[in-house]
């Protein structure tokens, strides 16, 4: 499964619904606030240094970016949210596009919400988790930059976030700590994403 995920390659960028790939197969979306570490997480997941561009200017992802692993198997990088200097009407366009994507995309099988472990569960994070809950989709909270905290603080934050998401969304949301720098939690994330993409079944059959 890990080797399959490492085959991910840039496929296309969609600025509107007409530019999306055909709605079939399997997609796992990644969402995160600016500077949460979403691009770094995607790069670590796929063992590629520049699959998802790590921007020095937060909030500059202005489209849905599709990375193809196999035909009809995609990782989807959702527009970042933060303090990018863009017009309000463009912000509104992104919001409407994302809303439509979540409500209508049949290929979407799961959502990873990337959060800085030092600043988890902001309004945007809860909104994204809410989208998944409304669709009945599984979601996974990825607490990034775990290496910035000691082990005790990591576990304390992890338990606090787990308790909060369970109270809001039930058992449809799982949570883990993660560090692209130390590769902490990479295998756990791969297992979850691979299962959502149906890669675990194919790998087992091949073995």
UniProtKB/Swiss-Prot annotation:
CDD domains: YihA_EngB (cd01876). Residues 24-199 form the EngB-type G domain. GO terms for cellular component: cytosol. One of its GO terms (molecular function) is GTP binding. One of its GO terms (biological process) is division septum assembly. GTP binds at residues 32-39, 59-63, 77-80, 144-147, 178-180. Mg(2+) binds at residues 39, 61. It comes from the Bacteria. Keywords: Cell cycle, Cell division, GTP-binding, Magnesium, Metal-binding, Nucleotide-binding, Septation. Its cofactor is Mg(2+). PANTHER family: ENGB-TYPE G DOMAIN-CONTAINING PROTEIN, MSS1/TRME-RELATED GTP-BINDING PROTEIN. Belongs to the TRAFAC class TrmE-Era-EngA-EngB-Septin-like GTPase superfamily. EngB GTPase family. Necessary for normal cell division and for the maintenance of normal septation. This is Probable GTP-binding protein EngB. It comes from Xanthomonas euvesicatoria pv. vesicatoria (strain 85-10) (Xanthomonas campestris pv. vesicatoria).
């Amino acid at each position: 499964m890990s080797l399959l995920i490492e085959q991910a390659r840039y496929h296309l960028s969609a600025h509107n619904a007409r530019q999306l790939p055909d709605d079939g197969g399997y997609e796992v979306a990644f969402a995160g606030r600016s500077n949460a570490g979403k691009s770094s997480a995607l790069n670590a997941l796929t063992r590629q240094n520049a699959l998802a561009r790590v921007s020095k200017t937060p909030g500059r992802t202005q489209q849905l970016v599709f990375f193809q692993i196999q035909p009809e198997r995609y990782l989807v990088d959702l527009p970042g949210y933060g303090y990018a200097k863009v017009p309000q009407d463009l912000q509104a366009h992104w919001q409407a596009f994302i809303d439509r994507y979540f409500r209508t995309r049949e290929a979407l099988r799961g959502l990873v919400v990337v959060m800085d472990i030092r600043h988890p569960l902001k309004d945007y994070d809860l909104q994204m988790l809410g989208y998944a809950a409304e669709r009945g989709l599984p979601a996974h909270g990825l607490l990034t930059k775990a290496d910035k905290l000691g082990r005790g603080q990591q576990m304390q934050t992890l338990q606090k976030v787990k308790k909060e998401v369970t109270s809001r969304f039930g058992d449809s949301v799982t949570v883990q700590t993660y560090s692209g720098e130390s590769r902490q939690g990479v295998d756990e994330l791969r297992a979850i994403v691979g299962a959502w993409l149906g890669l675990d079944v194919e790998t087992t059959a091949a073995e």
